[in-house]
Amino acid sequence: MRVETLFDVLDSDFYTGVPDSQLQALCNFLIDKYGISEHHVIAANEGNCTALAAGHYLATGNVPVVYMQNSGIGNIIKPVASLLNDKVYAIPCIFVVGWRGEPGIHDEPQHIYQGEVTLKLLEDMDIATFVIGKETTEAELYAKMKEFRNVLTNGKSVAFVVRKGALEYGNKVVYSNEYQMKREEVLEHIVAVTENDPIVSTTGKASRELFEIRERNGQGHE
């Protein structure tokens, strides 16, 4: 499905999220359309995004969109339970969630269990869900969004859970910044100082690079 279709269906003027490779099409589209602006905010974590979304709704009355990888669901539990839920302030929000570790789909080890519990976690937070796959049609998406509008009107949140390869975007975005060092170079400097001291790092590429640097240096991983 073209990501432009999803954008039209969601019909929101405010997006905030944490970039995810599974949602690369959406991330690239938003950078092309909005850049980093009052319409598109990239935050440090998914909880921050949800709080920003709540503030946007309270200020404008417009339903916001929060996008993220499913590994960030744990970070939204507190703001969803304490701010968004219809038993609290009834702030509606649309979540777009990249589904890593989907059962039956090969993925990295850290995504396996998260993928298994993704839909159940959203259900436990009283967030209605719809899974978008390669086979999902435009008509199905519009019909589900029409149903979701009634849910949002009642102050509840909804989530579109996106399978691998479900979204497409034709333009290629070249990312750049003015930082002088790449992440791997920063890690190399940290390892040089800490030597054999234990290091706790986030899952994903940072940990893989840290592992490779320590391997190259003949250091252990205990």
At which residue positions do the language-model features occur?
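Thiamine diphosphate
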Residues: M1-K120, I127, V131-G155, A159-E222
